[in-house]
Amino acid sequence: MELEYESKRPLYIPYAGPILLEFPLLNKGSAFTNDERSHFNLHGLLPEAVETIEEQAERAYRQYQDFKNDDDKHIYLRNIQDTNETLFYRLLEAHLSEMMPIIYTPTVGEACEHFSDIYRRARGLFISYPNREHIDDMLQNATKQNVKVIVVTDGERILGLGDQGIGGMGIPIGKLSLYTACGGISPAYTLPVVLDVGTNNPQRLNDPLYMGWRHPRISGDEYYAFVDEFIQAVKRRWPNVLLQFEDFAQNNATPLLNRYRDELCCFNDDIQGTAAVTLGSLIAASHAAGSQLRDQTVTFLGAGSAGCGIAEQIIAQMISEGLSEEQARARVFMVDRFGLLTDKLPNLLDFQSKLVQKSDALQSWNLTSDSISLQDVVRNAKPTVLIGVSGQPGLFTEELIREMHKHCARPIVMPLSNPTSRVEARPEDIINWTDGAALVATGSPFSPVSYKEKLYPIAQCNNSYIFPGIGLGVLASGAKRVTDGMLMAASRALAQCSPLAQNGEGALLPNIDDIQAVSKTIAMQVGKAAQLQGVAIVTSEEALAKAIEHNYWQPQYRTYKRTSF
């Protein structure tokens, strides 16, 4: 049954009695009116009082506050989501900045690690390799028929926690919660999926409660054939769906994106979403520092698919600001565990090969060894931007940051690794080491830093600023693909929303409580870019704006009327 939430007309429901209360998308709990209780055989199944959604949310928030640790709060919120989705999103809307770290990073990492321990109720689809011949049937079994957004993972690279097997399902569930809470995508249109291809994590394989396929991960041709079976089944079932790849290992993430990005409307949030939000933050930071991105010299710690995806977006923006491709690439330095990527380094991955520095250009560098370390790069290249996507804590040392600050009045430092325990440096330390001069953005949430009687807000360079707006823009415009131009438009729109860039003070990124307005701004620019690039039907700007509002779902109860199947 298709649930058209956008309309304010009554919703005709064929279910009644206890069955109706079991549908999270339909259940109102104590908010069913007396007429509805009569028509749907609910008298006696609910307490006497008829409540508003505001009263329900107040009770839920009081209960939420009674939990003392974040893991228990996460479990509580997920229980509400699995019972009454409208109430869940009304609660999130009222307390978004407080609850976002609970439903997503960093708390979702713990939920993924303990998925089989805290499992209560099925949500989404579990597509397992042993049942690969029945994928079409599994998609037909989905409780939601008109799916418009899918987030899919294979659980191999969950945040900075590695292989969690089907425990990775916590990520698609959390991401889609933010598509709704931040981007207004109706929960009736979203579907989380985990591809269960086994796990190489001995803790999971040896856990008697692990609920996934107890088998080492399949790989190579066998793996890619299975993913292709899933993609083709999705295309048959929902040909116009937006599919987001999430937390695939870097050796699979880029090949899958390259293979399917021209075949269906899809993107990889770890590569493209992370790149888009980081680029938007850098554009804003550059403006706040009185310069353009083309003027920056950028050093990365971490040269995986996420880091290289960010680097390519930065290079594209530098080129759009007037640099040649050669000039732009010469300003970006990639460092991994083997040192700086150069044209003499063997065994580079395909996506790394275009991001090497030419050895001839490094002849004048003062080096301490044959392997060019991060310290060597900072001392010789004199970067103005330092980005961490290594997943290794504490690698942005005091010595390193102070060396950077010697040649850069306002260094831009972005330790983006998740969760908090994996961050390359803590914002408080960066602010102290630079005497308050650094512009800091992190991947996980941090409290403002107090330094010399001044409060420094710390921007969370969170993909949640980007992907909900992309999703809303795709749905509103009817885009058939997600192009690089649409992602670039999202980055520039985010930069325009920066309080620091606009006013010269405040946070680098907007307040999380303003993220719904930010998502609509991004959706508008994404939709316009889709039209310009020929992947969406051209309409007027006014029509696109109306489509965005029409597609923006609000957590409000509708009136129900009874009908038969």
From Swiss-Prot:
Divalent metal cations. Prefers magnesium or manganese. It catalyses: (S)-malate + NAD(+) = pyruvate + CO2 + NADH; oxaloacetate + H(+) = pyruvate + CO2. A divalent metal cation binds at E246, D247, D270. Signal peptide: none annotated. GO terms for molecular function: malate dehydrogenase (decarboxylating) (NAD+) activity; metal ion binding; NAD binding; oxaloacetate decarboxylase activity. NAD(+) binds at R157, D270, N418. This is NAD-dependent malic enzyme. The gene is maeA.
